[in-house]
Regions:
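N-terminal leader segment of winged-helix/HTH proteins
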Residues: 1-40, 86
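Conserved segment of winged-helix/HTH DNA-binding domains
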Residues: 21, 54, 97-125
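Divalent metal-coordination and catalytic microenvironments
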Residues: 41, 74, 81
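Base-recognition residues in the alpha-helical recognition helix of bacterial helix-turn-helix
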Residues: 50, 76-77
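Beta-hairpin "wing" of winged helix-turn-helix
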Residues: 82-92, 99
C-alpha cells in the first residue's frame, strides 16, 4: 500500500474548517445538481431538456416526431426525468405536456445558452 504524504509545510486550519463548513452547508445543492447532471448525462435526455427549455412544453408525441424515436422510448426518458423531479407535467384532455421545473430551468439555462452560442458560431462559419 502506498503511503500518501502531503508536501505542504503548514496547513491553514481556518481555510480547511471554512471549506468543510461550506461543503456541509451546500450538501443539498450538490445532491440536487448531481442528480440533474446524471439525468442530463444521457444525450437523448439532454436533447429533451434542451427542447423543453426552447419550446417551454412538449408532449411525448411531439418529442417522438422531433427526435425520430418511438413514443415508448421517449416516455421512458420522460419518466426518468419526472422521477428525478427535473420535469413536471400538465394534462390537457388526454394529452400530457412536459416542461422543466423552474428550479431546474435556472440551473440548466446557462448550459443551453452555451449550446445556442456554439450553434450560432457553426451556422455563421
Amino acid at each position: 500500500m502506498i503511503k500518501q504524504t502531503c508536501i505542504r509545510q503548514f496547513a491553514d486550519h481556518q481555510q480547511i474548517k471554512k471549506c468543510k463548513e461550506r461543503i456541509k452547508t451546500a450538501n443539498k445543492s450538490f445532491a440536487q445538481l448531481s442528480n440533474i447532471l446524471a439525468l442530463a448525462g444521457n444525450e437523448v435526455r439532454l436533447t429533451i431538456l434542451y427542447l423543453l427549455e426552447e419550446e417551454k412544453e412538449l408532449c411525448p408525441c411531439d418529442l417522438a416526431d422531433i427526435l425520430g424515436m418511438s413514443i415508448p422510448a421517449i416516455s421512458q426518458h420522460l419518466r426518468k426525468l419526472k422521477d428525478g423531479n427535473v420535469v413536471e407535467t400538465r394534462k390537457e384532455g388526454q394529452t400530457i405536456y412536459y416542461s422543466l421545473t423552474q428550479d431546474n430551468l435556472k440551473i440548466l439555462r446557462p448550459f443551453f445558452k452555451h449550446i445556442n452560442q456554439q450553434t450560432q458560431k457553426l451556422e455563421t462559419a
